[in-house]
Swiss-Prot record:
Transmembrane segments: none annotated. Pfam families: AFP. Its main location: secreted. Forms a right-handed beta-helix that is stabilized by disulfide bonds. The building blocks of this beta-helix correspond to tandem repeats with the consensus sequence T-C-T-X-S-X-X-C-X-X-A-X. It is found in: Secreted. Disulfide bonds join 30-39, 36-46, 43-49, 55-61, 67-73, 79-85, 91-97, 103-109. This is Thermal hysteresis protein YL-1. Belongs to the insect antifreeze protein family. Contributes to protect body fluid from freezing at subzero temperatures. Lowers the freezing point of the hemolymph by about 2.5 degrees at a concentration of 1 mg/ml. Binds to nascent ice crystals and prevents further growth. One of its GO terms (cellular component) is extracellular region. Residues 1-28 form the signal peptide. SUPFAM superfamilies: Insect cysteine-rich antifreeze protein (SSF51156). It comes from Tenebrio molitor (Yellow mealworm beetle). Monomer.
Length: 112
């Protein structure tokens, strides 16, 4: 007795796997867009990047490790021209660098 797979063939399975891999790759980097919540790698010019590791000219980068020209960089370790870098070790032209040990033209730095 043969087992029928509801009309799916190996060809469709291969296509589905390729599409899945391509979509997964898209989550790594996002460029532009109002909502990049699915991006986990890098955001550039995005409006909402709460899960990205790296943010450039983006907003709401609450989990980013590195921020450049971005906002809400709450946990970033390195901030350049960014806002709300509460945990940053290094701040350049950034704001609210409360724990920074190296500050250049930034606000909120300890001892400044």
């Amino acid at each position: 007795m043969a087992f029928k797979t509801c009309g799916f063939s190996k060809k469709w399975l291969v296509i589905a796997v390729i599409v899945m891999c391509l979509c997964t790759e898209c989550y790594c980097q996002c460029t532009g867009g109002a909502d990049c919540t699915s991006c986990t790698g890098a955001c550039t010019g995005c409006g909402n990047c709460p899960n990205a590791v790296t943010c450039t000219n983006s907003q709401h980068c609450v989990k980013a490790n590195t921020c450049t020209g971005s906002t809400d960089c709450n946990t970033a370790q390195t901030c350049t021209n960014s806002k709300d870098c509460f945990e940053a070790n290094t701040c350049t032209d950034s704001t609210n660098c409360y724990k920074a040990t190296a500050c250049t033209n930034s606000s909120g730095c300890p001892g400044h």
